[in-house]
Curated annotation (Swiss-Prot):
Protein name in the entry: MOB kinase activator 2
Subunit structure: Binds STK38 and STK38L.
UniProt keyword list: Cytoplasm, Metal-binding, Nucleus, Phosphoprotein, Zinc
Protein location: Nucleus; Cytoplasm, Perinuclear region
Post-translational modification: Phosphorylated.
Record region (Disordered): 1-21, 217-237
Listed Gly residues bias regions: 217-229
GO MF annotation: an example: metal ion binding
Gene name tied to this protein: MOB2
Provenance organism: Homo sapiens
Length: 237
């Protein structure tokens, strides 16, 4: 995944984009942007003689670093004032602390919670072992699914709230390429609930068609962390 990041060429004006109902990221001239035409469907398949958990660990760690890097390019525009909630379309995400308590937070706070918690996990030898002979915990796959769900939220927020800045920085090709690779990998190993990703099905359909046959999932309330259902047309997760 060395293809991910290049230097930015321009500085956006820092203003929060107009309501993204127009979904600029779906416009053909933007969805065509890629930094490689590699067939990621082939890249995500588990290689022969490679342990499944090793493959999941390696790719999950890499996706974490690259999504963190992608977010860092627009982080100065994602503030407590511009993004008072962690929102994507009509869905508002809440963080759940170690005691399972729901925490309402701004988007930058949510992303910080995500990146800090994932960083702690991927550097924990008991969870992501790197030394020969160390075994993965029995709960490893469920932990990977949790990580992927949170990383998906970050990617979705970048598209929904900060695509204008990403476009101004000429990094939308990087974002699209990262999204395709991440989604195809997650679908290959059933790491994301279709209900969780349904909010971005329109983008997934456009970007991944012909790249691995990604199927759209139905919509649903209370997916992911077990948040309550829709209220006033705003879903909480």
């Amino acid at each position: 995944m060395d293809w991910l990041m290049g230097k930015s060429k321009a500085k956006p004006n820092g203003k929060k984009p107009a309501a993204e109902e127009r979904k600029a990221y779906l416009e053909p001239e933007h969805t065509k942007a890629r930094i490689t035409d590699f067939q990621f469907k082939e890249l995500v398949v588990l290689p022969r003689e490679i342990d499944l958990n090793e493959w999941l660990a390696s790719n999950t760690t890499t996706f974490f670093h690259h999504i963190n890097l992608q977010y860092s390019t627009i982080s100065e525009f994602c503030t407590g004032e511009t993004c008072q909630t962690m929102a994507v379309c009509n869905t508002q995400y809440y963080w759940y602390d170690e005691r399972g308590k729901k925490v309402k937070c701004t988007a930058p706070q949510y992303v910080d919670f995500v990146m800090s918690s994932v960083q702690k996990l991927v550097t924990d030898e008991d969870v992501f072992p790197t030394k020969y002979g160390r075994e993965f915990p029995s709960s490893f796959e469920s932990l990977v699914r949790k990580i992927c769900r949170h990383l998906f939220h970050v990617l979705a927020h970048i598209y929904w709230a900060h695509f204008k800045e990403t476009l101004a920085l000429e990094l939308h090709g990087h974002l699209n390429t990262l999204y395709v690779h991440f989604i195809l990998f997650a679908r290959e190993f059933n790491l994301l609930d279709p209900k969780e990703t349904a909010i971005m099905d329109d983008l997934t359909e456009v970007l991944c068609s012909g790249a691995g046959g990604v199927h759209s999932g139905g919509s649903g309330d209370g997916a992911g962390s077990g948040g309550p259902g829709a209220q006033n047309h705003v879903k909480e997760r």
